[in-house]
């Protein structure tokens, strides 16, 4: 019996119970030599035959078998090297990335060959140009036909993956994430609506390592050009990264305000000249 999925709630990729039937139909239409070893007792061969109305239908030629194991195997014969290379690229199980950062929401694929490639539970879905990394999402849904996931789902998963990686405290990973934000990679749009605390703190730490404690981020060279005389260095960066860093670091306006309110020196009342004392008394009277 087939035609119903038993994979729900398991670690298997399938869900709707139609994948095998559709695959057999494609194989039959292409005239490919496919043998399906269905457990220990049966062998299936898909083909197309016409029914009484002359309509081509998918049929299965089922023959008895006697195998020691009860495995379910699909054997596709006569695949050329070019087709095999293409098929391998669709599955991370067959072609794993060289460097993988795994989290509970998915994997960040830090491998030039996988840059921009989007996988869902190990199966290739699409390519996103200008991404800094590739991704294998665990909790994104693609639907029965494996459509491209929604941008919201992708962006949410990216923020969660980056946040988990940032919280691990690995210096090399922090540097890679900071590089991605500083390079205006396309996945940075994920942080327009959500900037996780763990990632923010890690990026602030990377910023201070590179530019020092007296530096602040700005979105243009003119934004903080008047702060140099205060001993403050301004660093032009992409707006999204500036927005994230300013959750902790001050803006130019805040630096100016703090400087204006800063006490430069303290003087005892007896140290004032007669003129300074007169000015102070005048100021107090105005406040009464």
Identify the role of each PLM range.
Residues 56-64, 75-239, 245-288:
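GHKL/Histidine-kinase-like ATPase module
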Residues 1-78, 82-83:
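GHKL (Bergerat-fold) ATPase N-terminal catalytic module, capturing the glycine-rich phosphate-binding loop
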């Amino acid at each position: 019996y087939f035609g119903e999925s038993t994979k729900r709630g398991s670690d298997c990729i399938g869900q709707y119970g139609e994948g095998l039937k559709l695959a057999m139909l494609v194989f039959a239409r292409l005239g490919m030599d496919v043998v399906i070893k269905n457990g220990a007792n049966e062998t299936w061969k898909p083909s197309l035959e016409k029914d009484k109305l002359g309509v081509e239908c998918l049929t299965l030629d089922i023959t008895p078998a006697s195998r020691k194991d009860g495995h379910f195997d699909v054997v596709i014969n006569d695949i050329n090297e070019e087709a095999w290379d293409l098929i391998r690229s669709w599955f991370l199980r067959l072609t794993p990335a060289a460097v993988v950062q795994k989290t509970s929401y998915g994997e960040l694929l830090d491998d030039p060959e996988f840059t921009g490639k989007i996988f869902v539970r190990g199966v290739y879905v699409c390519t996103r140009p200008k991404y800094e990394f590739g991704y294998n999402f665990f909790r994104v849904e693609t639907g029965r036909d494996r459509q491209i996931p929604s941008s919201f789902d992708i962006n949410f998963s990216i923020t969660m993956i980056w946040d988990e990686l940032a919280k691990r405290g690995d210096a090399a990973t922090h540097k890679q994430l900071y590089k991605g934000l500083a390079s205006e990679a396309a996945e940075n749009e994920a942080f327009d609506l959500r900037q996780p605390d763990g990632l923010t703190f890690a990026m602030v730490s990377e910023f201070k390592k590179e530019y020092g404690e007296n530096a602040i981020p700005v979105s243009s060279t003119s934004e903080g050009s008047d702060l140099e005389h205060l001993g403050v260095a301004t660093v032009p960066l992409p707006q999204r990264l500036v927005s994230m860093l300013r959750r902790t670091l001050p803006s130019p306006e805040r630096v100016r305000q703090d400087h204006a309110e800063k006490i430069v020196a303290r003087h005892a009342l007896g140290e004032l000249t007669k003129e300074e004392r007169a000015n102070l008394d005048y100021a107090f009277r105005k406040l009464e």
